[in-house]
């Protein structure tokens, strides 16, 4: 990407109406959600793209730094930091990462150029507890929509470890 694309802050996301944003970010790389002629990005996507130097985010006429976008995200979601680490790790590995809110998970993950996602990702801190009932419910939903359930565990050193959890029938 050569020229930085301008996005504008709007609540808990950012948007651009520039055709370049739609072509380069949405069509070619799977970022955001297209509504009419606007490309909307989540704060996690925006933070990632600002950190990479691909976009800049304006609030009124003032450009927001990566740290300011991160703080906005953290105010809206106390787990923004660990979700960002997982998002960044998956994107850096070449996967397309989208919200999985409607599936009761944090992210759905696609292989590049795939039409359907393979995985649902639930992000947890290593110190968090997850009840067997919660885990079972998440695996059932994933199985019901033909996806693999993956727990992304972030440790105290901010390293991410992925655990695939499967439904087994005997």
Curated annotation (Swiss-Prot):
Coiled coil: none annotated. Pfam families: tRNA_int_endo, tRNA_int_endo_N. It catalyses: pretRNA = a 3'-half-tRNA molecule with a 5'-OH end + a 5'-half-tRNA molecule with a 2',3'-cyclic phosphate end + an intron with a 2',3'-cyclic phosphate and a 5'-hydroxyl terminus. The keyword Repeat does not apply. Keywords: Lyase, tRNA processing. Its EC number is 4.6.1.16. One of its GO terms (molecular function) is tRNA-intron endonuclease activity. One of its GO terms (cellular component) is cytoplasm. GO terms for biological process: tRNA splicing, via endonucleolytic cleavage and ligation. The active site is at 110, 116, 147. Signal peptide: none annotated. The keyword Methyltransferase does not apply. CDD domains: tRNA-intron_lyase_C. NCBIfam families: endA. Homotetramer; although the tetramer contains four active sites, only two participate in the cleavage. Therefore, it should be considered as a dimer of dimers. Belongs to the tRNA-intron endonuclease family. Archaeal short subfamily. Endonuclease that removes tRNA introns. Cleaves pre-tRNA at the 5'- and 3'-splice sites to release the intron. The products are an intron and two tRNA half-molecules bearing 2',3' cyclic phosphate and 5'-OH termini. Recognizes a pseudosymmetric substrate in which 2 bulged loops of 3 bases are separated by a stem of 4 bp. This is tRNA-splicing endonuclease.
